[in-house]
Amino acid sequence: TKGIQLTNLNFNALGKQIIATNPMFRPGDKMLAVMPMFHGFGLGVSIHSMLVNGGCCILVPRFTPDSYAKLLLKYRCNLIAGVPTLYEALLRLPKMKNADLSCLKGVYSGGDSLSVELKKRFDQFLFDHHATIQVREGYGLTECVTASCLTPYHISREGSIGIPFPDTYYKIVEHGTQKEVPYGTEGEICLSGPTVMMGYLHHPEETAQTLQTHEDGLTWVHTGDLGYMDPDGFVYFRQRLKRMIVTSGYNVYPSQMENIFDAHELVQMSCVIGVPDKLKMQKVKAFVMLKPGVPANEETKAVLMTYIRKNVAKYALPYDIEFRSELPKTLVGKVAYRVLEEEELKKLSETAQEQ
């Protein structure tokens, strides 16, 4: 674990960027702040950016879908921000069935990949409940406080995480180099701007790897994330390099696989991981949470495998689909894929000992 050194300037620059990208904001607007204050998303966006611009924060001391919905409806909050699992939970909540959400001016998703299918469903949910907005997906990392890129107001492109904040610059480079790649070409996402950290506390080597001065004289954060940019400046996040699965020499992107699973009518949510394999290096495994009432049996598994075969390359096919009633979550509500990876490693270790 590394400590990230952030400054007052970093936080205040973020506050100005948030307002610049949200022209509908007015002093007195209320943010329902569910993200923890130890997280850049919670402290930087939900609290600091609101308070310095005259907004109001409604804190959620202990999150449950019911308590969140109760506060949202009681205080008629104008802005909500959270990870995708929050919006999935709201869709399933009976209390929200007849809710009037015309009070909402902004709905923001970050901290984890928002599937195309979930965005479509929640956008429709907002429309059906009298909101005149859509989910705006963002991207960022703690090395720049939190968000540094956001879908523009009332404009979106499928699969895009938006455009950079004012005074923040993005480029895509060949991984391991500073060489910029053409539009539409996948590479490592790099960013530069006033919210970039001072460095990692007491880790000069890691700081030098992440913060690099390019030929333009600017300091760039090498994020370790794969993505690309289109000619209009819209950025597309592909996958964190650390999560990428390499099977038989081919790259498999878990977030892409999860998007495909989540688009199926039987699936509520999914998580795809790589499991060590002697022959392939890694093999693909999917964990699936089914929609209420769908039986977790071999017939359902066969239906999903048939569907997946039609939508992915042969090398990306999962060797197994495991059904779960719930998927593990981190403290900020993201799907805890590392927990699933550790479970699989433990199984492999136990099997090896038995042999």
Briefly describe each language-model feature range.
Residues P27-G28, L104, T132, E186:
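Phosphate-coordination loops involved in phosphoryl transfer and adenosine-cofactor binding
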Residues I80, G193, M198-G199, Q209, ...:
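AMP-binding/adenylate-forming catalytic core of the ANL superfamily
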Residues T1-K16, T151:
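Conserved AMP-binding A3 loop
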Residues C77-G82, L91-S160, Y169:
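Gly/Ser/Thr-rich phosphate-binding loop
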Residues G3-Q5, A33, G55-R62, R136:
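Short beta-strand->loop structural element characteristic of the AMP-binding/adenylate-forming
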Residues K334-Q355:
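Phosphopantetheine-dependent thiolation modules in NRPS/PKS and related acyl-activating systems
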Residues I163-D167, T177-Q212, V252:
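Conserved ATP/PPi-binding loop(s) of AMP-dependent carboxylate-activating enzymes
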